[in-house]
């Protein structure tokens, strides 16, 4: 098991079922050292208000030896790469994931989806693109992976895509992983947990990476320090409380 999980939702996204405390308890049981809460951006129908994200600054950094990153899974809104995260939200957040979600940005043709995703990557506002292998949103894998490598943005391999949602993602995710491998970029693994019980579960992700001989040194979840180095290289100030994770 990798000790970092970068994608999960709490009851603040009302189609999810666990609290921050639930995730902390599960992290302790499973040996997760660092995790990110990434509730849906406010343009989703059942997402929390933008004040929810701004107020994350009151969270403790470490609880019982488990580090907590303040994050969001923002929505890509348009072909210009705009996301539903802005202003003071950026000041409170450590990790910004962004992806396509049908209630906010309907599926388009391959060229339009690719243009939108690359614009988001190039904006400098995101660290990870969520579930880029979604078959509802065809993209040019090579072009997206090369843009992501250029701008130091990771592409996610999402464990939930193989179990509960986005059915038919396997071939696309293998193509994503191979394209990132060839471009020299990063992948991030996300459980996309909507209940704490699936936190840290990456078994299906690892099958995808093994199938394309993906280099483990380009996986962000290998250690807290690797993930923090990545975020710091993107401009996040070092967080003293995480020094001993």
UniProtKB/Swiss-Prot annotation:
CDD domains: PHP_HisPPase_Ycdx_like. Its cofactor is Zn(2+). Zn(2+) 2 binds at residues 15, 40, 194. Keywords: Hydrolase, Metal-binding, Zinc. GO terms for biological process: bacterial-type flagellum-dependent swarming motility. Pfam families: PHP. Gene3D superfamilies: Metal-dependent hydrolases (3.20.20.140). Zn(2+) 3 binds at residues 73, 101, 131. Binds 3 Zn(2+) ions per subunit. GO terms for molecular function: phosphatase activity; zinc ion binding. Zn(2+) 1 binds at residues 7, 9, 73, 192. Its EC number is 3.1.3.-. GO terms for cellular component: cytosol. It is an enzyme of class 3 (hydrolase). Homotrimer. Belongs to the PHP family. This is Probable phosphatase YcdX. It comes from Escherichia coli O81 (strain ED1a). The gene is ycdX.
